[in-house]
C-alpha cells in the first residue's frame, strides 16, 4: 500500500456531529492535544504508528512535521468529493439494515486518550452500531491492516460514547462499484487497540525512541529517511 493510503487526514471533512466529551479536548484540529486528563492522540497517529513507529517520535518528540501533510489533506478532500459523486449512500445503508445514521462524527475518549472522525455511525436493526468508512480506492482482494485498524479504533470510541455494542464495521470501496466489505470486530481487536494506544502515549510522554524493522519499500520515500538511524 502507498503512504497516502495509510494516513487519514481528519481535519478537512467539514462540519458534522460532535459527541459531547468536554471542551478541553476540542475539535479534530489535526494535532494531538494536551488536556487535564493527559495526552489525546488522533486515530491517524495510530495509523502512522502502524506504518512506522518512528513517525510518532519524529513528529511529537522532535517536533519535525511531515512535508507531505498538506498533500495528504488535499488527497483526502478529493476522496470525499469523489465519494459523494459515486456512491448511492441511501441504497447502501438500506442494504446493511441501517435504521439511523450520523455522518462525519467527531468522537473522542478522555479515558482512552484518543480522538478522530467517523464517516458514518450506523445504527442497525439488531440493536448494535457499526462504523462505515468510504475509501476512494479499488478493492485489492484484501483489506489493508491500516483500514481495518481505523475501523477497530472507531468501534472502540463508538462503544464508549454511545454505550452500544459494536461487533462489526463496514468499508466501502467506491472505485470497485461501491463494494462494501464487512469487518468483524472482536474483543481481541479492541484489546490490541488499547495496547497500541498506550505504546504511542509512552513514546510521546516519555520520549522513547522506538525500534523499527527497516523496510526498503517504506523507507525509500520517507520524509525522515535522512535522519533515521
Role assignments for model-derived ranges:
Residues 45, 52-56, 208-229:
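Cysteine-cluster motifs in flexible loop/terminal segments that predominantly coordinate metals
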Residues 26, 188-213:
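Short, charged low-complexity linear segments at domain edges
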